[in-house]
Every structure is written in C-alpha cells, then in structure tokens.
Curated annotation (Swiss-Prot):
Annotated GO CC locations: extracellular region
Annotated S-S bridges: C32-C83, C36-C56, C42-C66, C46-C68
BP term (GO), one: defense response
Span of the signal peptide: 1-19
InterPro entries per record: LCN-type_CS_alpha_beta_dom, Scorpion_toxin-like, Scorpion_toxin-like_sf, Scorpion_toxinL, Scorpion_toxinL/defensin
Name of the gene: NTVIIIrgp1
Organism whose genome encodes this protein: Androctonus mauritanicus mauritanicus (Scorpion)
Pfam families: Toxin_3
Tissues of expression: Expressed by the venom gland.
Location in or out of the cell: Secreted
Domain of life from the UniProt record: Eukaryota
Stretches assigned to the LCN-type CS-alpha/beta domain: 22-84
Function per UniProt: Binds voltage-dependently at site-3 of sodium channels (Nav) and inhibits the inactivation of the activated channels, thereby blocking neuronal transmission.
Record protein name field: Neurotoxin 8-related gene product 1/2/3
Family: Belongs to the long (4 C-C) scorpion toxin superfamily. Sodium channel inhibitor family. Alpha subfamily.
Length: 86
C-alpha cells in the first residue's frame, strides 16, 4: 500500500500538477467574455484577476477574447452557453 501511495505522489510531482489554477477564457459573472483587440489589455485584466499572464486570441471560439494563463479557480471563466448580460 505504501508503494502505491509513493508512486502516486511521484507521478503528481513529475507532471507538475498545480491545484487551484487553470488556463481559460476569463469571463464576468454573467458568462460574458472579455472582448479584446490588444494583448496588453488582456495581460492587464488577467494579472489583475490573479493570473500569471494573458493575451488576446483573435477569431477564436468566442471571437476576440482574453485567454489567461494560470488563472485562479475562484475567478469566473467562460463556460458553454450564452452571455447573460448582452
């Protein structure tokens, strides 16, 4: 049993699992994306919300939208479905 625990722990360390963060399209509390035209805007918004960095994805799945790297789980992200505010 100890071997199984040690192997599992080693795999987690080797794969670099970071709990509490993810890469995603940042959204407001109404599931609306942050529309962008410049990387600097997204970088500012992402960092302000606790991400490592961010950039603008042009003509992506949701149009021109901000993509954040290592965004905390507490920050809303775009989920499938409509924007409820526009």
């Amino acid at each position: 049993m100890n071997y199984l625990t040690m192997i599992s722990l080693a795999l987690l360390v080797m794969t670099g699992v970071e709990s509490g963060v993810r890469d995603a399209y940042i959204a407001d509390n109404k599931n609306c994306i942050f529309t962008c035209y410049r990387d600097s805007y997204c970088k500012t918004e992402c960092i302000k919300n606790g991400a490592e960095t961010g950039y603008c994805i042009w003509i992506g799945e949701y149009g021109n939208a901000c993509w954040c790297i290592k965004l905390p789980n507490k920050v809303p992200i775009k989920v499938p479905g409509k924007c409820n505010g526009r």
